[in-house]
Design a protein with these regions (language model features):
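Acidic donor-binding loop at a coil-to-helix junction in glycosyltransferase catalytic cores
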Residues: 18-25
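Conserved nucleotide-sugar donor-binding
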Residues: 1-11
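Hydrophobic residues within well-ordered alpha-helices
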Residues: 29-30
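Juxtamembrane C-terminal module of membrane proteins
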Residues: 85, 115-143
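Active-site-adjacent helix/loop segment of glycosyltransferases
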Residues: 36, 45-113
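A conserved hydrophobic position in a structured secondary element of the catalytic/binding core
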Residues: 2, 21, 39
Length: 143
């Protein structure tokens, strides 16, 4: 939830963002001295059941977003946090005796990471490849 008065004062979400408009807005709030609260008791239902290729495309857009907004994401350790999550998930699956799920976690994570890295380097890619990699082709129409 956002305070409407501050949202309007700050100009709302960035006008052009492929992904992460909420994080970009939150980062700009923090830079202006406002706070962001974590509500541990908040109930949110948000789920995706993406295939490996869909994960690649989604994380490509995530990488593009981070590359386009270094003022927000420069100090964010996305890769390190992702690796920690993968390791934690694999340990959990071992403890629960569900080791047959581990190859899927590794494959999904590899697709996410490959997409993310490609997105971070999108400026070096040919347009045709960018259009293949993105989940949001509309974003690239006017570029």
């Amino acid at each position: 939830a956002y305070r409407r008065d501050i949202y309007l004062e700050m100009g709302g979400f960035v006008k052009r963002a492929i992904f992460n408009e909420d994080m970009i807005y939150a980062g700009s709030l923090i830079q202006e001295g406002y706070g962001i609260a974590y509500a541990a008791d908040a109930k949110v239902i948000h789920s995706h059941n993406y295939s490996c290729m869909q994960q690649f495309h989604r994380n490509f857009d995530l990488g593009v977003s981070q590359a386009e907004h270094p003022e927000i994401f420069e100090g964010v350790p996305s890769e390190g946090e992702g690796i920690k999550l993968v390791k934690k998930t694999i340990r959990y699956l071992f403890r629960k005796g569900k080791i047959w799920l581990i190859p899927g976690v590794i494959l999904q994570s590899g697709c996410k990471y490959a997409g993310y890295l490609a997105g971070k380097k999108y400026r070096k890619l040919p347009r045709k490849m960018i259009l293949w990699c993105t989940m949001n082709r509309e974003y690239w129409k006017d570029l």
